[in-house]
Amino acid sequence: MNKSVAPLLLAASILYGGAAAQQTVWGQCGGIGWSGPTNCAPGSACSTLNPYYAQCIPGATTITTSTRPPSGPTTTTRATSTSSSTPPTSSGVRFAGVNIAGFDFGCTTDGTCVTSKVYPPLKNFTGSNNYPDGIGQMQHFVNDDGMTIFRLPVGWQYLVNNNLGGNLDSTSISKYDQLVQGCLSLGAYCIVDIHNYARWNGGIIGQGGPTNAQFTSLWSQLASKYASQSRVWFGIMNEPHDVNINTWAATVQEVVTAIRNAGATSQFISLPGNDWQSAGAFISDGSAAALSQVTNPDGSTTNLIFDVHKYLDSDNSGTHAECTTNNIDGAFSPLATWLRQNNRQAILTETGGGNVQSCIQDMCQQIQYLNQNSDVYLGYVGWGAGSFDSTYVLTETPTGSGNSWTDTSLVSSCLARK
């Protein structure tokens, strides 16, 4: 999860025209308990995302209503509209899903991954059927929530049994592959995510720590294993931080080349930037400029997708239950402009909040914006389900009972697509 501590607070100004107040584009214009302006600025209309939150959507012409309060476990009808300032995107983002965590447990932000702390989301991991049922969760998310993608975090050390630069460990990769195959069997896209923060046991890859050759060896083996699987998505690294971005981009280039040369010639590859992959810092910290130079061996950038994260709490750390921002003005709007100008796309592979009203409000608004700008945003992946239990502050793990599952309020209100 994102550990950046650069808060981005939503600017919520109110414009006054004559005697009647008008709300700005993307501002709140209604909902239970709302006492502010209900008239929207010219060119936008008030659309209801849930009973507690309505928003001024550019280009919208109708007001829609939710079928239920957002705290319930059933499905919400959410508004979609097309912005007059961007290409038509009424169908929304292509990919929506959740992180299925567990193989990454034990990994810390210095790239140390204690393999004994791995808690795989595989129900029958030890033959006793008492582990979290990550495959069952994914089946529910696909069948009941219309999800199409899952990110499967795993520690580098786990995959090679702590042998830096070594071969994939046959036992470890067979266990992890059970989760990948379970994902693929559902028709979903499956992101193989190395959850090491651009490090191995404190050393930065290609910057005094592991060599680029040691890192590309890992990815060459993974790409070779999944070369025939068109729906396996290669997530190069989770949340690089405090790296030299130009040197890191050179490392990323070597990985992309290695993946393509291993036979995975057309699958999606995620390109992660500095500063914990912050969507708000992606342009300003030089990640956008540096990673724009990364290409496929043929010189194209086909299916090379920028990989960003963004949480909604006060310090963007993803550690608080309450949310304070929808990230539109501070992150996703300026990034959308840059992506359009440069003919590129991004995917949000971590985002989350508590199962409380402030997060339902802000997350639904954030997701709505991504759907409105699906020409540049391919999708979103919430954090997190899998081996997280109900006590985790950002849990998105559904509760299973027999053959049925009940979603958390944030998932049912905002992340689900049905």
Curated annotation (Swiss-Prot):
Query: Which cysteine-cysteine pairs are annotated as disulfide bonds in the entry?
Result: C107-C113, C183-C190, C323-C359, C364-C414
Major subcellular site: secreted
Which segment of the chain is annotated as a signal peptide? 1-21
Q: Does the keyword ATP-binding apply?
A: no
Give the Gene3D superfamilies listed for this entry: Glycosidases
Report the glycosylation sites: N124
Q: What is its EC number?
A: 3.2.1.4
Q: Which GO terms describe its biological process?
A: cellulose catabolic process
An example of a GO molecular function for this protein is: cellulose binding
Q: Which domain of life is it from?
A: Eukaryota
Give positions of region: Linker.
58-91
Which top EC class is given?
Answer: hydrolase
The Swiss-Prot or TrEMBL record describes its family as follows:
Belongs to the glycosyl hydrolase 5 (cellulase A) family.
- Job description of the protein: Endoglucanase (EG) that cleaves the internal beta-1,4-glucosidic bonds in cellulose. The degradation of cellulose involves an interplay between different cellulolytic enzymes. Hydrolysis starts with EGs, which cut internal glycosidic linkages to reduce the polymerization degree of the substrate and creates new chain ends for exocellobiohydrolases (CBHs). The CBH release the disaccharide cellobiose from the non-reducing end of the cellulose polymer chain. Finally, beta-1,4-glucosidases hydrolyze the cellobiose and other short cello-oligosaccharides into glucose units.
Provide the protein name: Endoglucanase EG-II
Q: Which gene encodes it?
A: egl2
